[in-house]
Design a protein with these regions (language model features):
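Extracytosolic ligand-binding ectodomains
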Residues: 1-333
Length: 333
């Protein structure tokens, strides 16, 4: 029962309904936030759990609104907040802010505005645009930066729009060391060359992953099956780890349901999903009370250096969250 929805909204509700009719216990693989909202609404009507490894829109935290949704990542409000912390460390006192008008972009915009206020950073110019906007439209917005003296530029948008944004950055010459660019998405291996050139030097948050026996086992299996070397600084690899953990999460919930001599139904599995507490490949997995969010997930801020000699995406860690205080620590200047 596998459906490839390409992170698009189109026909997502029908796709989820088709899976529900097959009497599945749970649905995994909700990645992008906008379609994940549709998935969560659709699955909740049938009491079917839906698990995400990448949809981090702030609104998806709401357990009352999305009672059958969970995610093995932290919400975007923490990601965006840490980007503002980094900008403050680099001396930013005013920024330009680009965001999409989908559910994720609007939620992220509220977070960025609140964090900027707390950091005494002035959002001088805001540019909003619809998800999947045309290259021409994004070009026109980025071109307006020429009329400003803003050197710190923020973007919160899904990956396809992030790629178009960096194409525009490259086109208009903003991929220069005097500019600091912060984006909420890590670009992937298949990103076009002109977008890669525009993205060199930008900062992006990603899930932090700690060494463990579970991770060692995953790496061994990953490398054997793919023929690739695990790269801890690659978004592709990190998301593969999170994707693996959503499978283990459902497995743990089913085992817990059986152990308690409960009937294995989607409702009982959902109740056990919320009680989960185990060591996954990406670290300890448990959930905040009254929320759909993973508890205490570490975050790293990465800097993109371009592609290396082997044609691989090259990111280096710049900062990470402290496991005790939750504050951002700069680890590489």
């Amino acid at each position: 029962n596998i459906i490839d929805y390409h992170c698009w909204n189109e026909n997502v509700e029908l796709m989820i309904q088709s899976l529900i009719r097959k009497n599945v216990l749970a649905i995994i693989g909700a990645e992008c936030s906008d379609p994940a909202v549709i998935m969560a609404n659709t699955s909740s009507k049938a009491n079917i759990p839906i698990i995400s490894y990448g949809a981090n829109a702030a609104e998806l935290s709401n357990k009352k609104k999305f009672p059958y949704f969970l995610r093995v990542i932290t919400p975007s409000e923490k990601y965006e907040k840490y980007l503002l912390d980094l900008a403050s460390n680099y001396g930013a006192n005013k920024i330009a802010f680009f965001h999409t008008t989908d559910s994720w972009g609007e939620g992220a915009a509220l977070v960025v505005k609140d964090a900027a206020k707390k950091e005494n950073i002035n959002i001088v110019k805001t540019f909003s645009f619809p998800r999947d906007a045309s290259q021409e439209h994004i070009d026109s917005l980025v071109n307006e930066l020429k009329e400003t003296d803003l050197k710190h530029i923020f973007l919160t948008s899904p990956t396809p729009d992030t790629v178009r944004f960096f194409k525009a950055i490259n086109k208009y010459g903003f991929n220069d060391p005097e500019y600091y660019i912060y984006a909420s998405e890590m670009i992937l291996n298949n990103t076009p060359l002109d977008a890669l050139e525009g993205a060199i030097g930008y900062f992006s948050p990603v899930a932090g992953i700690s060494d463990s026996k579970k991770l060692d086992y995953y790496i061994e299996t990953y490398e054997e099956l793919t023929g690739l070397t695990a790269d801890f600084n690659s978004a592709n690899f990190i998301y593969s780890v999170l994707s693996y953990d959503q499978v283990i999460l459902v497995s743990e919930a089913i085992k817990s349901t059986k152990k308690k001599n409960l009937e294995v139904t989607s409702e009982n599995v959902m109740s056990q999903l919320r009680l989960a507490n185990f060591q996954g490949a990406s670290g300890e997995i448990s959930f905040e009370n009254g929320s759909n969010d993973r508890l205490n997930m570490p975050v790293k801020i990465m800097k993109f250096l371009g592609k290396n000699d082997k044609g691989q995406m090259s990111f280096i860690p710049i900062a990470s969250t402290d496991a005790v205080t939750g504050y951002l620590k700069i680890i590489t200047k």
